[in-house]
């Protein structure tokens, strides 16, 4: 993990300010730091060295010095793109994916984004055009925040780096607070800070004297194909998984793997052929502690398992630190376990694989079985709606919520796996009035893109974009 910061607009002591901003994200890159300050632009980078350890330092400059890059992430297919660029006449001075990214942008422009395979967040400053170009990977694995503060445009890997800039104004965005109560996080591009936004996944931006433009460069597609037989799908999934895991292991340092008792992380650990796996658990209850299973599985695949039981004291003692690193409220408790497992892994290596994101693709959430699980779904929707409205007005009683939910279309009732407070509940709890959009207004654009798909696919598509 690396991190970067930057801002436009000439300001006194820009080199001191950018250094303070870099120091705020030192935890993202303990191996090295670099900065570039020139009139209208200041860039800073903190590096965790993974590929071309000696020559991949940043900020990284183009051959003629006209462009400067700060980059967080990995381009897994950088070697094949590099070969294409060499055939096009490009000459390289390093073996890093950083240089491939910058030269690729010079050669292909925005087309490069769809050529790349990886996780990335980056910003390029064009000295001649006085223009910033930034982009974020397909699923938003790597972060990119930006803020408009008067004449100053700030950007970086974490919001906390903005706080030390003298022109940053720290104000609570109450709209994000209301959305958080339903989604467990801020589901739109807005953040908890006024005038601070996050670049959506699969988007790029251009910032110059003409203004700010943000556009999507990629869309995920769920193209169902019922023709192949089960064995065909087994073989296809196996091929894709092996290819993906092998691509993710592109590194000049050792790679490990997280391991729980789940199918996803177990599958990844088994085919990755790494030397070390990492697991954490809470207490001794098997519902919250999967260390025993992880050790047994690691032994079966002949790998070293590193584990830790998190005590209540460690849990509460680190909670504020965990929240600090997330910048914004996030009500997903799995973030705490991830913090601890990352902590034990970081003591032995720099790169780990995980099974995160597999439930959305493989339909792993229990709620995905709901559309096909009851005979009641065969009752006409008009009848279910009437029953649902009657039940909604009745005093709370076990079982009534089933009829309320089934009296609504999927688009009305399912707003993602993170659903917490209803719009009416959050309005009654909050003491402030906001113009926050309703949950269904936020999810509507995603449902529109898969309006002809089956309900399970719709749910997967929504979660893939919103959870």
Q: What residue spans do the PLM features occupy?
A:
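N-terminal glutamine amidotransferase
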Residues: 1-74, 103-221, 242-246, 269-271, ...
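Short, intrinsically disordered, charge-balanced linker/junction segments flanking boundaries
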Residues: 271, 458-467
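ATP-dependent adenylate-handling active sites, centered on carboxylate activation for C-N bond formation
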Residues: 4, 8-19, 87, 128-153, ...
């Amino acid at each position: 993990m690396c991190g970067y910061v930057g801002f436009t607009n000439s300001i006194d002591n820009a080199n001191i300010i950018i250094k303070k901003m870099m120091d705020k994200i030192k935890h993202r890159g303990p191996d090295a730091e670099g900065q570039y300050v020139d009139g209208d632009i200041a860039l800073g980078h903190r590096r965790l060295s993974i590929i071309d350890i000696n020559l991949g330092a940043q900020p990284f400059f183009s051959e003629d010095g006209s462009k400067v890059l700060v980059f967080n992430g990995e381009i897994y297919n950088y070697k094949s793109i590099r070969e294409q660029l060499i055939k096009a006449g490009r000459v390289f001075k390093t073996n890093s994916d950083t240089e491939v990214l910058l030269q690729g942008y010079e050669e292909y422009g925005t087309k490069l984004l769809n050529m790349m395979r990886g996780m990335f967040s980056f910003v390029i400053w064009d000295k001649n055009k006085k223009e910033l170009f930034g982009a974020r990977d397909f699923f938003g694995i790597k972060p990119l925040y930006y803020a408009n503060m008067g004449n100053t445009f700030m950007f970086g890997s974490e919001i906390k780096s903005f706080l030390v800039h003298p022109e940053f104004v720290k104000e609570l965005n109450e709209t994000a607070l209301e959305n958080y109560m339903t989604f467990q996080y801020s589901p739109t591009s807005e953040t908890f800070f006024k005038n601070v936004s996050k670049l959506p996944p699969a988007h790029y931006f251009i910032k110059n004297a003409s203004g700010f433009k943000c556009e999507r460069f990629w869309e995920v597609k769920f193209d169902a194909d019922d023709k192949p037989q089960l064995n065909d799908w087994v073989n296809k999934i196996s091929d894709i998984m092996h290819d993906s895991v092998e691509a993710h292991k592109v590194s000049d340092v050792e790679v490990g793997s997280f391991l729980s008792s789940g199918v996803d992380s177990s599958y990844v650990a088994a085919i990755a052929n790494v030397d070390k796996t990492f697991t954490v658990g809470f207490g001794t209850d098997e519902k919250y502690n999967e260390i025993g299973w992880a050790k047994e599985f690691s032994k079966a695949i002949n790998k070293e398992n590193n584990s830790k039981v998190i005590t209540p004291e460690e849990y509460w003692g680190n909670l504020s630190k965990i929240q600090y690193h997330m910048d914004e409220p996030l009500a997903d408790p799995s973030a705490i376990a991830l913090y601890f497992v990352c902590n034990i892994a970081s003591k032995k290596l720099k790169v780990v694989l995980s099974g995160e994101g597999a439930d959305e693709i493989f339909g792993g959430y229990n709620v995905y079985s709901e559309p096909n699980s009851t005979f009641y779904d065969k009752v006409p929707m008009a009848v279910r709606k009437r029953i649902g409205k009657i039940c909604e007005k009745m005093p709370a009683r076990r079982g009534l919520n089933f009829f309320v939910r089934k009296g609504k279309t999927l688009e009305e009732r399912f707003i993602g796996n993170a659903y917490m407070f209803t719009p009416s509940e959050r309005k009654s709890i909050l003491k402030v009035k906001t113009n926050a959009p309703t949950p269904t207004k936020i999810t509507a654009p995603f449902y529109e893109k898969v309006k002809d798909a089956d309900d399970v696919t719709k749910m997967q598509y929504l979660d893939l974009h919103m959870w």
